[in-house]
Amino acid sequence: DRAGRIAAVGFSYRRLPAVAQLRDAVRDGAIGTPYFARAHFFSDYALDPSTPMAWRFDREASGGGTILDMATHTIDVLEHVLGDVREVLACTLDTTIARRPGEDGQTHEVTNDDTALISLRFAGGALASILSSRVGAGCPIELGLEVFGSAGHVRYAFNRPNEWILYQKDLGEPGADA
């Protein structure tokens, strides 16, 4: 509102059937009380320093780098599973590739982040750490999520979109559910 701009994101990852099943398992108590989570979203689309300067690398045009382009999706999946974020505990942003070539033959300063490291606390008390980067070598697109609780944990990886893993301490071995 203050900037006079509207931002909207199509949060498509929460609609994946495996993510919906994982969410239901957590909310139904399959892992007990959620204590903490870790999530990541990596891509390598900005890894090459010769990638031309574009709106994605300009804070004024984009509003932010990986934190708005990618981490928003990770935060949404975590909120979908754990409920609302109550507090941002820490956020560190880093620009790995500081300059990019422009169409004018000059190099231009990248004014937003390539990597974001975020710590959150959710309304239910669970903590989460998120690492998001658009310079993740060898990762065309990779989103992952783990939630640990008093009685087990769940795990999801986007590169296996129809699977998620549930480990329950009373049962021992991890098992996959689809």
Where are these regions (language model features)?
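C-terminal helix-rich "cap/oligomerization" subdomain common to oxidoreductases
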Residues: 2, 157, 171-172
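A short helix->loop->beta-strand "cap" motif at the edges of active sites that frequently abuts
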Residues: 3-5, 126-127
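Predominantly a Rossmann-like dinucleotide-binding segment in NAD(P)-dependent oxidoreductases
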Residues: 5-8, 13-109
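Intrinsic-disorder/low-complexity coil detector
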Residues: 48-51, 139, 173
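Contiguous beta-strand/loop segments that form the cofactor/metal-binding neighborhood of enzyme cores
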Residues: 76-168
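Glycine-rich phosphate/pyrophosphate-binding loop
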Residues: 174-178
